[in-house]
């Protein structure tokens, strides 16, 4: 793991993590949320990328007024990324149909060289066909991460694969079941938190590793309030 500054919370979220490394659970926010409350509540950011259908996706315009979960990661992340997406999917299943219909889930790749639109779409469909996958040039993705208050992810060292099976890795305990659809054995650093924007277009809470689907589900009705 390499420590890099984050605009949102220099203390609570002061690093990027390489896949295969833990993000420690944090105490519940003082407001009653079940995640971590940023030191400063910021507005929903503005950036334009493209979705897996090749269409321009203006993040602020497309998600305005809706509870929105955002995760920056990559499809060949061995542990944190698939678990985060599975946790969000499980949380949505625990809430009411009305809240579930209002919510949006956006996954932004930090690995544009390997995460093509078909790869990203196939990977996300393991969790939900409704999840939005966003891609772009390295410069566009870097700008989106900075707009969200984090430093851009970068390629890092190798991740061990199973001997004789370069397309498989050993899953850590607690990792959600998932499949990969590209080459393994490498890592890309990324912010290992789920960003949760509310219907008022603010960021009142983020969820690090260790937060459960039930925790996220409990917060969803609050996030959905106008």
Predicted segment positions?
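Short active-site neighborhood of thiol/selenol oxidoreductases, capturing the structured segment around
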Residues: 60-84, 88
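A short, hydrophobic beta-strand/beta-hairpin element that forms part of a small beta-sheet core
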Residues: 192-205
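N-terminal "domain-start" segment that seeds a small globular fold
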Residues: 25-61, 86
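Short, internal strand/loop/helix patches
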Residues: 121-187, 191
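Bacterial signal peptide processing site
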Residues: 19-23
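C-terminal motif of bacterial Sec signal peptides marking the signal peptidase cleavage site
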Residues: 14-18
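Non-catalytic, surface beta->alpha helical segment in thiol-disulfide oxidoreductase systems
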Residues: 204-224
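Structural microenvironment flanking redox-active thiols in thiol-disulfide oxidoreductases
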Residues: 83-144
């Amino acid at each position: 793991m390499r420590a890099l500054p984050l605009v949102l919370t220099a203390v609570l979220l002061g690093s990027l993590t390489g896949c295969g490394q833990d993000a420690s659970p944090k105490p519940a926010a003082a407001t009653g949320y079940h995640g971590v409350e940023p030191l400063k509540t910021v507005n929903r950011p503005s950036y334009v990328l493209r979705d897996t259908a090749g269409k321009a996706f203006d993040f602020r315009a497309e998600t305005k007024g809706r509870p929105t979960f955002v995760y920056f990661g990559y499809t060949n992340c061995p542990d944190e990324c698939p678990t985060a997406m599975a946790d969000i999917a499980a949380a949505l299943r625990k809430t009411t149909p009305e809240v579930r219909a209002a919510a949006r889930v956006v996954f932004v790749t930090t690995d544009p060289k390997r995460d093509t639109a078909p790869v990203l779409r196939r990977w996300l469909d393991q969790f939900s066909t409704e999840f939005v996958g966003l891609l772009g040039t390295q410069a566009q993705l870097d700008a989106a991460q900075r707009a969200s208050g984090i430093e851009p992810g970068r390629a890092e060292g190798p991740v061990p694969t199973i001997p004789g099976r370069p397309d498989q890795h050993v899953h850590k305990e607690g990792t959600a079941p998932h499949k990969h659809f590209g080459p393994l054995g490498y890592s890309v650093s990324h912010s290992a938190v789920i960003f949760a924007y509310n219907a008022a277009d603010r960021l009142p809470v983020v969820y690090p590793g260790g937060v459960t689907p039930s925790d996220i589900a409990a917060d969803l009705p609050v996030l959905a309030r106008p």
